[in-house]
Design a protein with these regions (language model features):
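An acidic, glycine-rich "communication" segment
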Residues: 26, 31-35, 59-63, 154-188
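Bacterial N-terminal signal peptides that target proteins for export
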Residues: 1-10
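Short alpha-beta junction capping motif
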Residues: 51, 111-156
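Aromatic-Pro/Gly-enriched surface loop or interdomain linker
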Residues: 23-116, 120-123
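Surface-exposed patches in mature extracellular/periplasmic domains of secreted proteins
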Residues: 88-103, 147-152, 170-178
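Cleavable N-terminal signal peptides
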Residues: 11-12, 22
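Extracytoplasmic/secreted proteins, especially bacterial periplasmic and envelope-associated proteins
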Residues: 74-78, 82, 130, 134, ...
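N-terminal signal peptide c-region/cleavage motif recognized by signal peptidases
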Residues: 17-19
Length: 188
């Protein structure tokens, strides 16, 4: 009788684990790899502000990082929605009234339609020569690039090395506390 009891306990634990796993997958929010890409149209027709997610090449991986697709698509969508709620910025919307948030390769011509480019987890970036050229062109034409999600010194150095290739004549430096940009709208 003792072995039968042990078998029932093991079977019960296995069923509980399987049910918990199935339930967790049912409510899982997909993000990052596996999410459908929202590629931009040939031209942005509604004239509203939009944000584009920068797709770039990576030459290494980090634990819990997904390269360009980190936080995709929810971080960008949230940023756009909050921009429209907290400012007078009119954002680009699709036919259903949802925010247009595009995914763009650095090699796509649509890059130059993006006023605001977001790069996530850029500590894994490893740009191909054409990506270096295109990102340089984008930035020199006045494009705005926001990058985030660095994980340590190695990630920062990886990003800084990439930017030294893209804009060698513009070194990265800390903005001093008395710089005018810190008092443009609010004192920081």
């Amino acid at each position: 009788m003792f072995p039968r009891r042990r078998v029932l306990i093991v079977v019960g634990l296995l069923l509980s684990a399987a049910a918990s796993s199935a339930l967790a997958q049912r409510f899982r929010v997909m993000e990052g790899p596996g999410m459908p890409l929202h590629m931009p149209p040939s031209h942005f027709s509604d004239g509203g502000f939009t944000i584009c997610k920068m797709m770039y090449s990576s030459n290494r991986r980090e634990a819990n990082g997904f390269g360009w697709s980190t936080d995709y698509p929810f971080a960008g969508l949230n940023l756009m929605v909050r921009s429209s709620e907290l400012t007078k910025t009119r954002i680009s919307k699709d036919g259903r009234g949802e925010a247009n948030y595009w995914t763009v390769h650095l090699t796509d011509d649509a890059l130059f339609e993006c006023p605001f480019l977001v790069g996530s987890d850029v500590g894994t970036i490893g740009l191909a020569p054409l990506e270096v050229t295109r990102l340089r062109q984008y930035l020199l034409k006045g494009g705005f690039l926001w990058v985030d999600d660095f994980w340590g010194t190695r990630a920062w150095e990886q990003w800084a090395d990439a930017m030294r290739e893209v804009l060698p004549e513009f070194p990265i430096f800390d903005i001093p506390p008395d710089h005018p940009i810190r008092e443009t709208l609010f004192e920081v």
